[in-house]
UniProtKB/Swiss-Prot annotation:
Annotated protein name in UniProt: Proteasome-activating nucleotidase
Coiled-coil residues: 22-67
Family matches, as InterPro entries: 26S_Proteasome_ATPase, AAA+_ATPase, AAA_lid_3, ATPase_AAA_core, ATPase_AAA_CS, NA-bd_OB-fold, Nucleotidase_PAN, P-loop_NTPase
Record remark: domains: Consists of three main regions, an N-terminal coiled-coil domain that may assist in substrate recognition, an interdomain involved in PAN hexamerization, and a C-terminal ATPase domain of the AAA type.
Function: ATPase which is responsible for recognizing, binding, unfolding and translocation of substrate proteins into the archaeal 20S proteasome core particle. Is essential for opening the gate of the 20S proteasome via an interaction with its C-terminus, thereby allowing substrate entry and access to the site of proteolysis. Thus, the C-termini of the proteasomal ATPase function like a 'key in a lock' to induce gate opening and therefore regulate proteolysis.
Family in the record: Belongs to the AAA ATPase family.
One GO term (biological process): protein unfolding
Region annotated Docks into pockets in the proteasome alpha-ring to cause gate opening, chain positions: 405-407
Molecular function terms from GO: ATP binding; ATP hydrolysis activity
Gene label: pan
Organism: Methanococcus maripaludis (strain C5 / ATCC BAA-1333)
Source organism superkingdom: Archaea
Assigned keywords, A-Z: ATP-binding, Chaperone, Coiled coil, Cytoplasm, Nucleotide-binding, Proteasome
Subunit details: Homohexamer. The hexameric complex has a two-ring architecture resembling a top hat that caps the 20S proteasome core at one or both ends. Upon ATP-binding, the C-terminus of PAN interacts with the alpha-rings of the proteasome core by binding to the intersubunit pockets.
Residues reported in the UniProt entry to bind ATP: 192-197, 331
Length: 407
């Protein structure tokens, strides 16, 4: 059987088209495979780069771990630009070289440095040492008490503002008049009259740093510890300048010096002498203000009371009737009162200080809660005053020296 020539030609053409289609399909598959391999290669390259980076980081960490520790030392003297005398932490003194990475201007007597173990060369200068106890005395969060929250102490608030707040906020006023701003104020008076409250209000009203110290914290067991802590507190205050240092219960460390031979008294006297030197010594105190509080001014050492250390001594006395009324208004502002005459309460609450009046308000509220009432009436305040007065008389003890002091 024979086929036409045209039919044979079509078969040959179809075979060629099929072959060409297969070749194109193979090429497309190969190109797709190449593309996948290229993408995979890029992913592997990125992973390789990431692994190399991690490897470098781990190598650097290992190198740091392999570096031997450095020896701590203190500069005693600088001989020239590249040599210094150092007292090492191991004991002996050495004449050592300075590393090229160390600035010679940083090498001053007393500076802390790091020494290489083998050559003892100075390789790093450390920042000044700070006592963690002094650092902990700085108040980061300001108290939420303002002068408006203090009643019956208008004259005292004015005096403390003039001494502490005004020099920090408007120093140009003192420059125009030509006087040096006061440096410190001593608050004294019976317990509960608001001495610590005034210091909290000063911390709230000013933007200065605030360092709070209790006098007993400066009294330490071992020789020199208390004096060192005093130095560190004032050093911290100068670094944080403008700053206010509040020393509560200062009589714990600033009592009159005697001829006592006990070791504890001698250490307290050393701490006091360091405090006197820091308050008004050879070095300027800078923009650092001091507020101190005590309820025993009669036992304070005369040296600490002189001007230059405490330029103003403010008595926080017992509030009068108007003062007690102001205090009661502050403490009863959010209380649900019904038929209460605060003037009458202030009149019958004689010889009570601010802390007593706050306790009276709390007790009056407790009486209302006990009787399942949602408001406080006048009888609650009368019962509260009777309770607080009776508690004070029961816990009182004779202190004849205070009678003269507070009148």
């Amino acid at each position: 059987m024979s086929y036409p020539d045209d039919y044979s030609t079509d078969i040959e053409k179809n075979k060629m088209d099929l072959k060409e289609f297969k070749e194109k399909t193979q090429i497309a598959e190969l190109e797709s495979k190449v593309l996948r391999l290229e993408l995979k290669n890029k992913d592997i390259s990125r992973e390789n780069v990431q692994i190399k980076k991690e490897n470098e980081i781990l190598k650097r960490e290992l190198d740091k771990l392999r570096i031997p520790p450095l020896i701590l030392g203190t500069i005693l003297d600088r001989v020239n630009e590249r040599k210094a005398v150092v007292k090492s932490s191991t004991g002996p003194n050495f004449l050592v070289n300075l590393s090229q990475f160390v600035d010679p201007d940083d090498i001053v007597p007393g500076a802390r440095v790091c020494l290489n173990q083998q050559t003892l060369a100075i390789v790093e200068v450390l920042p000044k040492e700070k006592d963690y106890r002094a650092m902990a005395m700085e108040i980061e969060e300001k108290p939420d008490i303002s002068f408006e929250d203090i009643g019956g102490l208008n004259n005292q608030i004015r005096d403390i503002k003039e001494v502490v707040e005004l020099p920090l906020k408007n120093p140009e006023l003192f420059e125009k008049v030509g006087i040096v701003p006061p440096k410190g104020v001593l608050l004294y008076g019976p317990p509960g009259t608001g001495k610590t409250l005034l210091a909290k209000a000063v911390a709230y009203e000013t933007n200065a740093s605030f360092v709070r110290v209790v006098g007993s914290e400066l009294v330490k067991k071992f020789i020199g510890e208390g004096a060192k802590l005093v130095r560190d507190v004032f050093k911290l205050a100068k670094e944080k300048s403008p700053c206010i240092i509040f020393i509560d219960e200062i009589d714990a460390v600033a009592s009159k010096r005697t001829e006592s031979l006990t070791g504890g008294d001698r250490e307290v006297q050393r701490t006091l002498m360091q405090l006197l030197a820091e308050m008004d010594g050879f070095d300027s105190r800078g923009d650092v203000k001091i507020i101190a509080a005590t309820n025993r001014p009669d036992i304070l050492d005369p040296a600490i009371l002189r001007p230059g250390r405490f330029d103003r001594i403010i008595e926080i006395s017992m509030p009068d009737e108007d003062g007690r009324l102001d205090i009661l208004k502050i403490h009863t502002e959010k209380m649900n009162l019904k038929g209460v005459d605060l003037r009458e309460v202030a009149k019958i609450a004689e010889n009570m200080v601010g802390a007593d009046l706050k306790a009276v308000c709390t007790e009056a509220g407790m009486f209302a809660i006990r009787e399942e009432r949602e408001f406080i009436k006048m009888d609650d305040f009368r019962e509260a005053i009777t309770k607080i007065t009776g508690k004070k008389e029961k816990c009182s003890y004779d202190m004849p020296q205070l009678t003269v002091m507070y009148g």
